[in-house]
A protein has these predicted regions:
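A glycine-rich beta-turn/hairpin centered on an aromatic-Pro dipeptide
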Residues: 161-194
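C-terminal interaction segments
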Residues: 211-258
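Acidic/His-leaning functional-site neighborhoods
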Residues: 184-218, 222
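Hydrophobic, proline/glycine-rich low-complexity stretches
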Residues: 2-36, 40-41, 52-60, 74-78
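Short, contiguous alpha-helical
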Residues: 30-70, 113-173, 226
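Short, solvent-exposed segments of well-ordered alpha helices
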Residues: 5-8, 12, 37, 44, ...
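Short, helix-capping/interhelical loops that line the mouth of catalytic, cofactor-
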Residues: 2-8, 53-113, 149-159
């Protein structure tokens, strides 16, 4: 069974993915090139989102439980420059602000988050976990925009499946379709079960084999493809599906309340 990433690993991987993002932006022929996986955005827009977003979350984590919403940084400091060297430095500073705030907070500081009804705690550690996936998926977006998409690193993707299910899917919002049990299986050897019902959705990591006939459907793929599917970058057809695929299609359409 793969381990849950601890804060030092999360910070290391955020830094690694942010560095990979900066490399794409630095070498891209045209920052006005569209990002197909983020309709309506250019690479410049994506860079603005990554930089300003990390600064905003840094300020939110620093404020801790006193924050009543996501803290917005100074507009002038949160605006990405167009000149390449200045943009690279601005992105690096944005990442460093986030890493410094998370490191200072530690994993357990109470923190405002947009998720309030999920299984993920409202803590600095949960923010770090989600920020890793935010940067990792947007790095893939940038790579895909220049025609060079690279699968998410194994340890990032394995944590990403569980993080997405716990934060973005597991909720007390009622599942609007027929109750179902879904198992996501990563070809790297990990699996997660998602129970969907009128009481909401609950996710859990599976420690052993799933008994035959237990889930209504099992969807298998690499952990990277599972994460990219969950974030809407890849279609359901990327999965090797065993069982009734309707719950998988329903999950793509479902937008549970936060």
């Amino acid at each position: 069974m793969h381990p849950t990433l601890e804060l030092p690993d999360l910070l290391r991987l955020i830094d690694e993915r942010a560095t990979a993002f900066r490399a794409v932006i630095a070498s891209a022929p045209d920052l006005d090139a569209p990002v197909p996986s983020c309709p309506g955005w250019t690479l410049a827009d994506l860079a603005q989102h990554i930089g300003a977003g990390r600064r905003s979350w840094a300020a939110t984590v620093a404020l801790g439980a006193a924050a009543t919403g996501r803290v917005q940084p100074d507009p002038e400091e949160a605006t990405a420059p167009r000149e390449r060297a200045a943009l690279d430095a601005w992105l690096a500073t944005s990442t460093q602000q986030l890493l410094d705030a998370l490191r200072e907070a530690g994993p357990d500081r109470p923190c405002w988050t947009w998720w309030t009804r999920s299984q993920s705690p409202q803590s600095s550690g949960a923010v770090a976990r989600h920020q890793l996936q935010e940067v990792a998926v947007h790095t893939w977006d940038a790579q895909a925009a220049v025609g060079e998409p690279v699968p998410l690193p194994r340890e990032v993707a394995l944590d990403g499946v569980e993080e997405f299910l716990s934060t973005c899917v597991a909720t007390t919002s009622p599942w609007p379709y027929e109750s179902a049990t879904v198992v996501y299986r990563a070809t790297e050897g990990a699996a997660w079960r998602l129970q969907l019902s009128a009481e909401g959705a609950r996710a859990e990591r599976l420690a052993g084999a799933v008994r035959a006939g237990q889930p209504d459907v099992t969807g298998s793929a690499t952990a990277s493809d599972l994460v990219l599917l969950m974030y809407g970058r890849l279609p359901v057809d990327v999965l090797d599906i065993d069982g009734d695929r309707r719950p998988l299609d329903g999950l793509v359409e479902w937008e549970p309340e936060d």
